[in-house]
C-alpha cells in the first residue's frame, strides 16, 4: 500500500485499525544520511556508539518509512500488510516554521541507484510536525491571545506616546472630579497597536476605568458609569473584534493540527504500545524519535528507558539470525544483511527424506498477503519492501522454528558491532 500526502488522512483510520489488531509491527526507514566512525572498536562504550547515532539523527532525517502489519493466524500461516510512506520535510508557508534539511552525497547516490524518486518524496510525501515543533507553534499562537502580547506591544511602543496618554488620563480625572469636563476622554491614536498599548496601560494603571477602541481614537470612561445605552455601539465593535481575533486563533490552531500529519500514526503506535520488529534497527528507532519527538535523549540509559516505555517489546531480526540457536541453519555461512537472509529462507523446500537442516516448508506457504506478488518484484531499499522482508524473517522464526530463545533476545539491539540489552541496561 502506497501512502502519500493526498491520501494519508483518508487512510489513517484504516492504518489505525491495523495498528489495533496486528500482533507485530515491523518498521524500516531510509535516511538522508548516516554518520560513520570507522575508528569505533571494543574500547568504545555503548554510550560512544549511541552518541554517534544520536548526532546523526539530529543532522540528517528520514526520507521514507516502511511499516508492515504482521498477523499470526491459527492455521499456521500469517498475513503481512506492507505500507510504504514517503516523508516530506516541506512545511506550509503559513506556519512560518524554519526547518533544516541535510543530506549526505553518498546516501543520495546510493538511493538513486536503487531507483528512489526524490521528486516524488518531496512533492507527494506526507508532511509532519514533530512534537516540539507543534508545541512551539501552539505557544506562539497562545502568546498572541494573552495579555503577554499586549505587554510586549506596550513595552515596544514609543514611550513618549504612553507618557502623553497617561498624562491625558490623569488630567481628565482631576478635571472630572471638579465636574468641569466631559464624562469620557478620547485619546487620538495612529494605529491599532498603539490603541492596544494604551488599553493595556489603562487596564494596569487605572483599574477603575474602561477603554473602548474606535477607528482613530481610544475612548476612556469610568467603569461604573458605562451604561448599556452609552456603550452598546462600542460593545458591538469590541465583540466583533474579539470574535475576529478568536477566529484567527482558532484558524491558526487548526492549521497546526492539520500539519501534524504523519506523526498522528506514530502517536497511535505509541498509544497502543505495540510489539515492534526491525532489522539492525537501532538507527531506525533513534531517527524515528528524532523525527517525531523533535529530540533524542542524550544518554543511552534514557534512550533505553524511552524504548521500553514506548513499545511492548522490540525484536531485531539481524540479532535473531546471528544469535538464535534455532536459526543457525539459515545464517550459517552467509551475511546477515536483509537481502541475503530473505533469499535463503525463500529457497524451495527440501525433500522430506533429505538430511538438510533447511525447513521442508516453503516460505510462500507461510504468508497470506494480497501484496505478496507485488512485493516479490520490488527492489530492495524501498522502506516498505524492507519492512515486509523484515516481517518475513520474523514470521519464519516464530512459525517455522521452536523460537525457544525468543525471550532471551527480546529488547536486544545490535549497535555498531556491539549489543544493547535494554532490559539489563535499565535494571
Curated annotation (Swiss-Prot):
A cellular-component GO term for this protein: nucleus
Disulfide bonds: none
Alphabetical GO biological process terms: priRNA 3'-end processing; regulatory ncRNA-mediated heterochromatin formation; siRNA 3'-end processing
InterPro entries for this protein: CAF1_poly(A)_ribonucleases, RNase_CAF1, RNaseH-like_sf, RNaseH_sf
GO molecular function: 3'-5'-RNA exonuclease activity; poly(A)-specific ribonuclease activity; RNA binding
Entry-linked Pfam families: CAF1
Domain of life (superkingdom): Eukaryota
Similarity annotation: Belongs to the CAF1 family.
Protein name listed in UniProt: Uncharacterized protein C29A10.09c
Organism lineage string: Eukaryota, Fungi, Dikarya, Ascomycota, Taphrinomycotina
Amino acid at each position: 500500500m502506497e501512502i502519500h500526502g493526498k491520501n494519508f488522512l483518508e487512510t489513517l483510520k484504516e492504518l489505525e485499525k491495523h495498528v489495533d489488531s496486528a500482533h507485530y509491527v515491523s518498521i524500516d526507514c531510509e535516511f538522508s544520511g548516516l554518520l560513520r566512525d570507522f575508528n569505533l572498536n571494543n574500547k568504545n562504550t555503548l554510550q560512544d556508539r549511541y552518541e554517534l547515532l544520536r548526532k546523526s539523527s539530529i543532522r540528517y532525517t528520514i526520507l521514507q518509512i516502511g511499516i508492515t502489519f504482521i498477523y499470526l493466524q491459527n492455521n499456521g500461516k500469517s498475513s503481512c500488510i506492507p505500507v510504504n510512506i514517503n516523508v516530506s520535510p516541506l512545511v506550509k508557508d503559513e506556519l512560518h516554521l524554519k526547518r533544516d534539511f541535510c543530506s549526505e552525497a553518498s546516501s543520495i547516490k546510493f538511493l538513486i541507484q536503487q531507483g528512489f524518486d526524490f521528486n516524488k518524496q518531496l512533492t507527494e510525501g506526507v508532511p509532519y510536525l514533530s512534537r516540539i515543533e507543534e508545541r512551539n507553534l501552539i505557544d506562539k499562537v497562545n502568546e498572541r491571545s494573552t495579555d503577554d502580547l499586549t505587554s510586549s506591544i506596550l513595552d515596544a511602543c514609543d514611550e513618549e506616546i504612553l507618557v502623553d496618554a497617561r498624562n491625558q488620563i490623569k488630567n481628565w480625572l482631576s478635571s472630572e472630579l471638579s465636574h468641569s469636563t466631559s464624562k469620557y476622554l478620547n485619546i487620538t491614536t495612529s494605529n491599532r497597536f498603539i490603541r492596544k498599548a494604551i488599553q493595556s496601560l489603562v487596564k494596569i494603571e487605572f483599574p477603575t476605568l474602561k477603554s473602548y477602541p474606535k477607528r482613530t481614537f481610544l475612548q476612556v470612561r469610568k467603569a461604573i458609569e458605562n451604561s448599556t445605552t452609552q456603550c452598546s455601539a462600542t460593545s458591538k465593535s469590541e465583540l466583533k473584534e474579539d470574535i475576529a481575533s478568536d477566529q484567527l486563533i482558532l484558524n491558526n490552531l487548526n492549521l497546526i493540527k492539520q500539519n501534524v500529519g504523519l506523526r498522528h500514526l506514530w502517536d497511535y503506535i505509541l498509544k497502543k504500545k505495540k510489539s515492534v520488529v526491525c532489522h539492525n534497527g537501532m538507527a531506525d528507532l533513534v531517527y524515528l524519535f528524532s523525527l517525531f519527538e523533535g529530540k533524542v535523549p542524550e544518554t543511552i540509559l534514557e534512550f533505553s528507558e524511552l524504548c521500553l516505555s514506548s513499545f511492548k517489546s522490540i525484536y531485531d531480526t539481524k540479532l535473531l539470525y546471528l544469535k538464535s540457536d534455532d536459526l543457525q541453519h539459515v545464517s550459517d555461512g552467509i551475511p546477515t544483511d536483509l537481502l541475503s537472509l530473505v533469499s535463503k529462507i525463500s529457497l524451495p523446500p527440501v525433500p522430506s527424506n533429505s538430511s538438510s537442516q533447511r525447513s521442508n516448508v516453503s516460505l510462500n506457504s507461510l504468508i497470506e498477503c494480497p501484496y505478496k506478488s507485488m512485493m516479490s518484484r520490488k527492489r530492495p531499499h524501498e522502506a516498505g519492501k524492507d519492512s515486509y522482508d523484515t516481517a518475513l524473517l520474523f514470521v519464519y522464526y516464530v512459525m517455522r522454528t521452536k523460537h525457544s530463545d525468543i525471550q532471551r533476545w527480546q529488547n536486544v539491539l545490535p549497535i555498531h558491532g556491539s549489543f544493547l540489552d535494554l532490559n539489563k541496561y535499565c535494571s
